[in-house]
């Protein structure tokens, strides 16, 4: 089933100029720097507080939304689960909001990050002034398989376990590097 048949897709907040942080701001802005392509995650501790000029088309992010990075060399999606109130996505994102109860957000987020989708996007995406850009129509036309909810749940759980495993391997590699570096430094300093 086409993505636009199971979800609504909205562009991120488009500003008429530079966004300036303001302590008295009414909204927070999630930007590209706030998401991680490696971990497929996001952080909210450094969101910019600002005062937008909202239109009726702007969506505040909510749990279950999927942020899709539409600009740049690497397109990926991140599932939103917890976040503060009044958070807008920046213009570099599309916000994908499920409108069909036959699909789980976790499953859709996972599927949009798979290599067949990456290849499809490379083939059909356009080029912006300075970088590749995924057009909304291209994103909307992605075919999404709809297995039973039980299967979607299983796929989502396996993906969560895989992410945890990858995070543990990275932490282990960092600790090993620090240990071996320490051993080598100690050996070079105590060569007498």
Task: Describe each PLM feature range.
Residues 87-92, 126-153:
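A short glycine-rich beta-alpha junction/loop motif
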Residues 65-68:
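Generic structural signal for buried aliphatic residues
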Residues 1-19, 24-25, 146-192:
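Non-catalytic DNA-recognition/assembly elements of restriction-modification systems
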Residues 55-56, 83, 129:
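A structural connector/turn signal
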Residues 20-27, 46-47, 59-61, 79-91:
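Short, surface-exposed loop/turn microsegments at beta-strand edges and helix-strand junctions
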Residues 102-138:
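Short, positively charged
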Residues 4-18, 33-63:
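Sequence-specific dsDNA recognition surfaces
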Residues 70-111:
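A short beta-sheet element
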């Amino acid at each position: 089933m086409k993505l636009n048949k199971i979800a609504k897709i909205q562009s991120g907040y488009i500003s008429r100029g530079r966004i300036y942080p303001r302590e008295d701001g009414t909204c927070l802005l999630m930007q590209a720097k706030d998401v991680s392509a490696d971990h497929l995650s996001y952080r909210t501790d450094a969101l910019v507080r600002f005062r937008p000029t909202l239109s009726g088309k702007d969506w505040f992010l909510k749990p279950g939304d999927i942020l899709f990075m539409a600009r740049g060399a690497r397109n990926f999606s991140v599932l939103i689960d917890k976040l503060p109130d009044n958070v807008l996505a920046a213009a570099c994102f599309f916000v994908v909001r499920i409108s069909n109860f036959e699909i789980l957000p976790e499953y859709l987020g996972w599927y949009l990050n798979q290599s067949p989708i990456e290849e499809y996007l490379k083939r059909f995406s356009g080029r912006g002034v300075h970088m590749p850009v995924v057009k909304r129509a291209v994103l909307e036309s992605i075919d999404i398989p709809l297995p039973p909810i039980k299967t979607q749940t299983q796929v989502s759980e396996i993906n969560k376990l895989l992410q945890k495993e990858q995070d543990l391997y990275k932490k282990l590699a960092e600790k090993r590097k620090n240990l071996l570096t320490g051993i080598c430094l100690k050996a070079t300093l105590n060569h007498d």
